[in-house]
């Protein structure tokens, strides 16, 4: 068996494994709900998936937190478990634990170390229970659960859906399906050698803020969806939710917002439950249709890269944005990106990836190294404006999203071997001759 190939060039780290290596997978689920003063409606979890082929070993960790990054997790998992990369995939639930109003991404959050320890524990448990694995993936379109919350108004600019005017009601209670959205859900199914499903990973683009301002801990609709999928498959199946490019996508069903923790008005969790159920139904149906994975030797490839950007308004800002490009079995392409990408970027990338004949999955809100870039609007959305598009002085420069997607596309073709690193062969050869004969009707 050939050794792992590791190439370093221009800030790019490429890792790929020979097809003769056995593909191994491990998974674990750990409750990360801290002991705090807040009431708990439903627990939040860290669900990990480790993939290994030869010397290449990396982990996805889906966390029920708004935004979570940690260099400590990366360091310890590399030293303790030989993990080359840990990708933290935040579901972006707005009802995460918030001690004294602090979010998971804010400095001084007293639960940060606890979260880190629990996530490291999940990765360790995954490593302790590796099994020979087979992987399949698919995607399907179904009636949209979300809408584009940046609604174009009379002056030609867009405003966020919670901004009302003479024509639109705050929070879109009429459930008008504004677009663009991505109505597809993507699914990765991982089986053991007996054909028993062990892991279901769902990839969907929609904000997890149905019960925002509920002043209680909840994993929101992703938590409901994961629970329903796990119940449907049973046998200890673990279900990971990975957010897509849902930066400007809001759920069509939301709960009315409370004004504060002492507000006598109570949060209605029915919209959250129903949205999670609808998503889970599609995921279960798709996962079951995938059936057993092909028996050919699996392949696993990973390429890490980074790009630097400045701010749109504040040119003193420096965003070091790390990207991961993954190809599994030459048929599954994953573009992992940090930040809150707008959905048009996902639609554009997937359209280009269709030409490659692969199942494309964009993992948004997925951090491995570097800075968290916040909202990342496509160029048109940046021009139209609205929340996350032109509000705030810490926004990333215009065009950063397109640059990230273009780099992901180029890195995919580097990984699959089509992108040459030297000039290609010249096709023309001198001396070729032909004779043109007139055609007589």
Residue map of PLM features:
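Bacterial Sec-dependent N-terminal signal peptides
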Residues: 1-22
């Amino acid at each position: 068996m050939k050794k792992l190939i590791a190439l370093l060039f221009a800030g790019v780290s490429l890792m790929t494994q020979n097809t003769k290596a056995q593909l191994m997978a491990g998974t674990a689920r750990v409750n990360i709900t801290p002991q705090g003063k807040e009431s708990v409606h439903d627990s939040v979890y860290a669900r990990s998936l480790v993939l290994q082929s030869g010397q290449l070993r990396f982990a996805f960790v889906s966390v029920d937190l708004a935004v979570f990054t940690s260099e400590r997790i990366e360091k310890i998992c590399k030293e303790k478990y030989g993990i080359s990369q840990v990708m933290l995939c935040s579901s972006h639930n707005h009802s995460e634990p918030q001690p004294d109003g602090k979010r998971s991404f804010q400095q001084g959050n007293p639960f940060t170390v606890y979260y880190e320890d629990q996530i490291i524990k999940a990765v360790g448990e995954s490593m302790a229970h590796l099994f020979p694995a087979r992987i399949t993936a698919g995607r399907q379109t179904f009636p949209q659960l979300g809408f584009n919350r940046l609604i174009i108004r009379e002056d030609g600019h867009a405003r966020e859906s919670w901004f009302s005017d003479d024509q639109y009601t705050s929070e879109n209670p009429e459930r008008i399906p504004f677009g663009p959205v991505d109505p597809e859900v993507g699914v990765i199914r991982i089986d053991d050698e007996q054909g028993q499903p062990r892991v279901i990973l769902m990839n969907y683009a929609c904000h997890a803020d149905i019960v925002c301002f509920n002043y209680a801990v909840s994993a929101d609709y992703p938590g409901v969806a994961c629970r329903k999928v796990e119940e449907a498959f049973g046998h200890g199946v673990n279900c990971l939710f990975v957010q897509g490019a849902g930066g400007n996508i809001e759920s069509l069903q939301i709960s009315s917002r409370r004004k504060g923790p002492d507000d006598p008005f109570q949060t209605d969790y029915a919209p959250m439950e129903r949205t999670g159920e609808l998503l889970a139904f599609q995921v279960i149906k798709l996962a079951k249709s995938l059936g057993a994975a092909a028996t050919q030797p699996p392949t696993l490839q990973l390429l890490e890269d980074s790009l630097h950007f400045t701010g749109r308004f504040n040119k003193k800002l420096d965003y070091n944005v790390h990207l991961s490009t993954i190809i599994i079995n030459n048929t599954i392409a994953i573009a992992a990106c940090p930040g809150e990408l707008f959905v048009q970027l996902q639609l554009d990338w997937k359209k280009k990836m269709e030409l490659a004949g692969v199942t494309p999955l964009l993992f948004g809100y997925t951090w491995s190294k570097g800075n968290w870039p916040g909202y990342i609007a496509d160029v048109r959305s940046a021009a139209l404006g609205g929340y996350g598009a032109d509000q705030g002085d810490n926004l990333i420069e215009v065009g950063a999203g397109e640059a990230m997607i273009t780099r992901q596309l180029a890195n995919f073709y580097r990984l699959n071997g089509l992108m040459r690193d030297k000039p290609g062969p010249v096709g023309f050869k001198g001396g070729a001759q032909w004779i043109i004969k007139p055609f007589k009707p």
